[in-house]
């Protein structure tokens, strides 16, 4: 479902190459020589390098020499185990069997060394991720009732000769399991060796079993589906198909805590609607701003994990209050998951649901802003999101301007623009995660132009509409072995938005790209978010509805 929506949404997105050309903030920042040059210190990826004062000091020195003006340090990773001295949150003590220094305070070290070097330091927290599938001990496991409740479909494959096997949906295949893909199947991930597949028609008849490996492009027949399996599961598929038996699918809806699902992502999300969760997250932000001289707070994963959450009783009550009536059929009035894996069937309350979830996130961000600014008004508030705005409703977020409307999107609820939260942030980092720096290069390579940093940056500006500063953000791993393309991607971010955020430090270090950064940032400059009065000027001077 999400892959199809992604392509549909993206195809509607990048239609105007000059989307950011009329940005008032871009022009002001150029005139004043302001540019966000931000590097992210991921907690887990850089654990060894940053687990001592010496390592931090050396890294900060290199950042200063590369003319970086802002460091974002991850102090509450997705595990919910923090890397500062907290009286509220549990501390990280080890990772992958490696002990973390008991009395070491990463945030204190980065703030001290960063400020010595004249670099602003912003503390990042993974807001609604409070646990990791690979590391126990996070608050999500201690407080199971905090976890998001995910709407699942328990499926099994049955045969006309009386056999039945449990079934995984897409995103596999898993060792020893059968997976099913619906009629909208396309490229299916990296398949393991000895993978067998059969195409099943609408009447249950199966094609001859065949083997496939690697990245396969498989299409299910109209009204039918594809079954895949490897090892024993693949052998069972072949044997059953060869026998002439027919396949059918059976299923029933199920509600599960996210830690109990087959979620391939590591993060265990807690419910953004839960008042106890909100109070806990706000207390962490309050603690950081009160105890540390941070220049900013950055909110990562301030969202739902996917479209299938949250279906808890807590959320149901709040949703019914939001729409002013009881939901007669839960969850089908919102949407129904199909028997054959594929797109959801939207119910009569689907658009209300999208607006409700986005409003929950906007309202929470308003609380965050009020909390942080009441302690220290000068602390900047940043947000990290994906740049694929037209499909970001999937995770319950509208990071655009409250004046940005896109009714041509078939999912867009009436008044959805009111849930946009760009006006509540001091800056937004949008992940422009594409391997092609420019539209032209994407087209030259036979790809659609939206698969470019340039297009993603322009659409980010289009959605935010100068409501706040926008920094195009790069995933450096996508440029491994291509420093020239990395440099061009940085230039696109600097040209189309008000700066560039680099994710992550570990790749700059591993690829030894400090010299590339010096090329991209030849002279020191200040960041736009260090001049917040520019936002007031931009917002107050903009015509209504612009």
What is each stretch, according to the model?
Residues 49-64, 277-288, 405-423, 453, ...:
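Short, acidic/polar
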Residues 66-102:
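Aromatic-lined carbohydrate-binding/catalytic grooves of carbohydrate-active enzymes
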Residues 54-81, 291-292, 418-430, 496-499:
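Catalytic domains of carbohydrate-active enzymes, especially glycoside hydrolases
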Residues 143, 149-172, 257-425, 430-436, ...:
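Polysaccharide-binding and catalytic clefts of secreted carbohydrate-active enzymes
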Residues 41-50, 88-104, 263-282, 347-362, ...:
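The substrate-binding groove and active-site-proximal loops of carbohydrate-active enzymes
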Residues 37-41, 71-73, 121-123, 297-300, ...:
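Hydrophobic faces of well-ordered beta-strands that scaffold small-molecule active sites
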Residues 22-53, 477:
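Boundary/entry segment of secreted carbohydrate-active catalytic domains
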Residues 415-545:
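Substrate-binding cleft of secreted/luminal carbohydrate-active enzymes
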């Amino acid at each position: 479902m999400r892959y199809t929506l992604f392509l549909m949404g993206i195809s509607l997105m990048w239609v105007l190459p000059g989307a950011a050309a009329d940005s008032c903030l871009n022009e002001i920042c150029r005139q004043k020589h302001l540019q966000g040059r931000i590097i992210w210190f991921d907690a887990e990826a850089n654990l060894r390098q940053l687990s001592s004062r010496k390592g931090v000091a050396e890294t900060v020195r290199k950042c200063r020499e590369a003319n970086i003006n802002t460091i974002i340090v991850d102090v509450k990773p997705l595990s919910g185990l923090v890397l500062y001295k907290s009286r509220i949150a549990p501390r990280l003590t080890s990772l992958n069997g490696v002990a973390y220094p008991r009395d070491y305070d990463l945030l204190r070290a980065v703030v001290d060394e960063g400020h010595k070097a004249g670099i602003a330091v912003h503390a990042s927290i993974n807001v609604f991720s409070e646990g990791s599938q690979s590391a126990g001990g996070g608050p999500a496991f201690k407080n199971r009732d905090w976890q998001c409740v995910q709407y699942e479909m328990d499926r099994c494959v049955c045969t006309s000769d009386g056999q039945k096997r449990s079934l995984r949906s897409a995103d596999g295949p898993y060792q020893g399991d059968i997976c099913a893909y619906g009629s909208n199947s396309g490229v299916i991930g990296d398949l393991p060796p000895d993978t067998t597949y059969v195409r099943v028609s609408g009447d249950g008849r199966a094609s001859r079993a065949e083997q496939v490996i690697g990245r396969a492009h498989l299409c299910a027949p109209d009204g039918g589906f594809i079954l895949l399996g490897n090892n024993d599961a693949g052998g069972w598929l072949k044997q059953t198909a060869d026998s002439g038996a027919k396949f059918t699918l059976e299923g029933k809806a199920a509600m599960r805590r996210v830690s109990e699902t087959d979620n391939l992502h590591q993060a265990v999300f807690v419910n953004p609607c839960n008042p106890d969760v909100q109070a806990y997250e706000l207390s962490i932000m309050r603690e950081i701003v009160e105890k540390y001289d941070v220049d900013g707070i950055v909110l990562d994963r301030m969202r739902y994990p996917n479209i299938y959450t949250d279906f808890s009783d807590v959320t149901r009550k709040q949703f019914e209050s939001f729409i002013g009536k009881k939901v007669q059929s839960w969850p089908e009035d919102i949407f129904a998951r199909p028997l054959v894996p594929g797109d959801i069937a939207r119910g009569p309350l689907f658009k209300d649901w999208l607006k409700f979830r986005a409003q929950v996130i906007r309202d929470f961000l308003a609380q965050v802003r009020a909390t942080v600014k009441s302690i220290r008004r000068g602390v900047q508030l940043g947000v990290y999101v994906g740049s694929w705005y037209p499909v970001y409703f999937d995770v319950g977020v509208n990071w655009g301007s409250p004046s940005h409307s896109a009714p041509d999107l078939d999912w867009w609820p009436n008044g959805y623009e009111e849930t946009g939260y760009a006006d509540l942030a001091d800056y937004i980092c949008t992940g422009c995660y594409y391997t092609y720096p420019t539209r032209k290069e994407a087209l030259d390579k036979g790809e659609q132009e939206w698969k470019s940093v340039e297009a993603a940056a322009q659409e980010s500006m289009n959605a935010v509409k100068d409501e706040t500063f926008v920094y195009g953000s790069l995933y450096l791993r996508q440029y491994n072995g291509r420093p020239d393309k990395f440099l061009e991607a940085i230039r696109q971010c600097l040209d189309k938005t008000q700066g560039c955020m680099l994710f992550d430090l570990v790749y700059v270090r591993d690829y030894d790209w400090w010299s590339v950064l010096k090329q991209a940032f030849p002279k020191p400059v200040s960041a736009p978010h260090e001049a917040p009065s520019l936002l007031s000027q931009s917002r107050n001077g903009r015509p209504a509805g612009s």
